[in-house]
Design a protein with these regions (language model features):
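A ligand-binding cleft/hinge motif common to bilobed small-molecule-binding domains
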Residues: 87-91, 215, 219-238
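Early extracytoplasmic/lumenal segment of secretory-pathway proteins
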Residues: 24-90
Length: 339
């Protein structure tokens, strides 16, 4: 009787311990620039295989997240960086803030879209590229033609009808500016931006906002990025998406572990998920180019040859010169930024 009672008590105690261990959750603080309409699906996908890890997001535009991470360098708060531009994440790596880690399944990914070091300091998820959203109804009403090139947007007919993101606050804005400087040369890039600025009505803090503005008819043209352009058109706005013939600036949504994280095991689990085929299938619902070569996105309003339209992009150059580029841009054009 006593032995049976003792055995039962021990069994119950072990069960209670096991239940407690199972129920105990780890919370990761994740800094992200992902769109809010992407985070829910990504979180659900991750937690299917990691139910004991909760993700608490601090979400803002790329420029704000970049400034926040750098400001916290002496006392980092985040455990993981998720979906922030590779140009910014490369800066964090150069500042010694990241932990190198090769996720399970990393070898299957396209090496072109992740850090070249082994083990990598950051892992790419997908490519996002410049797009011009043109409102066909407002364009016809105002006699403003659909542009076909970046050069077209400097013509007088577009004066006061173009919006684009401020590169200091928006990763989309920075990929535009970096792409122009790299493809046109620095002198040519600044000359182009001087001419474009004459037609700009407003610089926004969001990469999505210019396309939404064009979709709503607030302005005829919005310089944005492919995900938001496809989304706005898919929802029925009267927009045509233009992929300027000179080539498209682009960046990579990248993820990394902060070196000082005290939850390294959970952080590695999140990075393992980032590299999975399942995660890439989730990205492919939003982007036309993802890191896993076996995942073939097909978005209705994005050209199948998008990859061929991308300009050459030196991420190391962009990361090294980012501060100087932004300082010069702010000096020349910031007066038109929305309040």
């Amino acid at each position: 009787m006593n032995r049976s009672f003792a055995t039962t008590a021990a069994t119950l105690a072990l069960a209670a311990l096991a239940t407690g261990a199972w129920a105990q959750k780890t919370e990761l603080l994740v800094y992200t620039a992902l769109e809010t309409d992407q985070l829910k699906a990504y979180t659900e996908s991750f937690q299917k295989t990691n139910p004991n890890i909760d993700l608490r997001f601090v979400r803002d535009s790329t420029g704000v997240i970049t400034a926040k991470v750098l400001a916290e360098k002496a006392n980092p708060q985040a455990d993981v960086i998720l979906g922030v531009s590779a140009t910014s994440v490369a800066i964090f790596a150069a500042e010694g803030m990241l932990a190198p880690y090769s996720p399970v399944g990393f070898a299957a990914l396209n090496p072109m879209y992740s850090d070249s070091k082994r083990p990598p300091y950051w892992v790419g998820q997908d490519v996002y590229a410049a797009v011009v959203c043109y409102n066909t109804v407002e364009g016809a009403k105002k006699g403003i033609p659909k542009p076909e090139s970046w050069a077209d947007l400097t013509k007088p007919v577009y004066k006061g009808q173009v919006t684009m993101p401020n590169p200091a606050s928006s990763g989309t804005g920075f990929l535009d500016v970096s792409g122009w400087l790299q493809s046109m040369g620095e002198a040519g890039g600044w000359k182009f931006m001087d001419q474009l600025d004459a037609n700009i009505a407003q610089y926004t803090h969001s990469g999505s906002k210019p396309c939404r503005q064009a979709g709503a008819g607030e302005f005829v043209v919005g310089i944005s990025f492919d995900f938001r352009g496809n989304d706005v058109k898919q929802k029925g706005a009267p927009v045509e998406l233009v992929f300027p013939k000179e080539g498209l600036g682009w960046d990579i949504e990248a993820s990394a572990i902060m070196k000082n994280s005290k939850k390294m095991d959970a952080a590695k689990k999140l990075m393992d998920w980032v590299a999975t085929k399942e995660a890439n299938e989730a990205y492919s619902k939003n982007f036309a180019i993802v890191s896993h070569p076996d995942v073939k996105p097909s978005l209705p309003h994005i050209p199948a040859d998008l990859e061929k339209r991308l300009v050459k992009n030196d991420f190391a150059w962009a990361a090294t010169h980012r501060d100087a580029i932004l300082a010069e841009w702010q000096k020349r054009y910031a007066a038109k930024t929305e309040k």
